[in-house]
C-alpha cells in the first residue's frame, strides 16, 4: 500500500516539509536500521531526486547530479532504499500490458516523493519561482497527481503504475484494480497540451491487446484547469481538485 495512507511520516502541511527534512537528516534515517549515513550525501540525493522528479532518471543520473565526488552506485542505491523505507521516496513502477505488436516496454520506475512538498522544500522553490519555471512546476504537479491517485487507488484496493515504450508513447499513470480493470491517465498542467495528450491516450489504448487485457475503463487527462468534461472522442478531462474515490 502507498505510504500516503495511514502514515504519520507523510507531510501534508507544506510549511512542515523543511523541518521534516532537517529532522530526517539529524536522526530519523538512522532509526530505520541503526546504520549511520553520510548526511551530506543524503541531503544531496534528496535534492537530486527533487530535480529529477517525475522522470525515469537512473541511479547513475541521480549520482552524477550530486555535487563533488559522488558515492558509488551501490551506496546511492542503499541510500535511496533507506529513504524509500523512511517514506520520503515512492517510485512509480512500470506497467507491462500485453500489446498487439512486439513493442519493447520500458521498465524503469518514475522518480517520486511520497509527498511532493518535500521536493519543493529540497529545491527551495517558492510560488514565484515555480511560476517562472513551468517545466519544474509541471513535473511537481505531475507528482502531486500521482500522490492523489495513489491515495484514492489504495482506498479502492488498486495500484498505480506508469507506461512508456521504446517509441516514447506513454501514460503518466495507469490505474489498475485487482480484478484487472484499468484506466490510462496523462497529466497536463495547462489546457494547451490537452489535445495532444488525448490523442496520445487514444493511440496507446489502440496498441493494447484488448482480447487479453480488456478495454481501458476510461482515458483521462488530469489537469490544473478548472473544468471537467468529456470530449467528443470519449476522453475525460478533469482538474485534479475534482478527484474522489
PLM feature spans:
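Structural beta-sheet core signal
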Residues: 184, 220-221
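Accessory nucleic acid-recognition modules appended to NTPase machines
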Residues: 15-181
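Short, small-residue-biased leader/transition segments that mark boundaries at the very start
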Residues: 3-10
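Switch/connector loops and helix/strand junctions flanking conserved nucleotide-binding motifs
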Residues: 121, 194-195, 228-232
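Mg2+/Mn2+-dependent nuclease catalytic core
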Residues: 190-210
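Domain-level recognition of nuclease-like catalytic cores that cleave nucleotide substrates
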Residues: 224-245
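Short beta-strand/turn micro-motifs composed of small residues
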Residues: 164, 221-223
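Active-site ExK catalytic segment of metal-dependent nucleases
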Residues: 181-193
Amino acid at each position: 500500500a502507498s505510504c500516503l495512507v495511514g502514515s504519520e511520516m507523510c507531510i501534508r502541511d507544506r510549511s512542515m516539509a523543511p523541518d521534516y527534512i532537517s529532522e530526517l537528516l539529524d536522526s530519523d534515517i538512522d532509526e530505520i536500521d541503526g546504520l549511520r549515513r553520510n548526511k551530506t550525501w543524503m541531503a544531496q540525493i534528496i535534492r537530486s531526486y527533487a530535480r529529477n522528479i517525475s522522470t525515469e532518471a537512473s541511479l547513475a543520473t541521480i549520482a552524477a547530479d550530486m555535487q563533488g565526488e559522488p558515492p558509488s552506485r551501490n551506496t546511492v542505491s542503499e541510500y535511496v532504499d533507506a529513504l524509500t523505507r523512511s517514506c520520503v521516496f515512492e517510485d512509480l513502477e512500470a506497467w507491462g500490458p500485453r500489446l498487439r505488436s512486439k513493442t519493447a516496454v520500458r521498465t524503469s520506475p518514475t522518480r517520486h516523493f511520497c509527498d511532493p512538498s518535500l521536493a519543493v522544500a529540497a529545491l527551495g522553490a517558492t510560488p514565484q519561482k515555480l511560476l517562472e519555471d513551468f517545466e519544474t512546476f509541471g513535473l511537481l504537479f505531475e507528482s502531486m497527481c500521482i500522490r492523489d491517485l495513489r491515495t484514492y487507488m489504495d482506498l479502492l484496493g488498486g495500484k498505480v503504475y506508469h507506461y512508456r515504450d521504446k517509441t516514447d508513447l506513454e501514460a503518466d499513470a495507469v490505474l489498475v484494480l485487482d480484478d484487472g480493470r484499468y484506466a490510462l491517465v496523462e497529466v497536463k498542467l495547462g489546457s494547451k497540451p490537452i489535445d495532444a495528450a488525448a490523442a496520445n491516450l487514444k493511440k496507446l489504448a489502440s496498441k493494447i491487446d484488448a482480447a487479453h487485457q480488456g478495454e481501458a475503463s476510461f482515458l483521462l487527462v488530469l489537469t490544473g484547469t478548472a473544468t471537467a468534461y468529456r470530449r467528443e472522442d470519449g476522453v475525460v478531462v478533469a482538474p485534479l481538485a475534482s478527484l474522489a474515490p
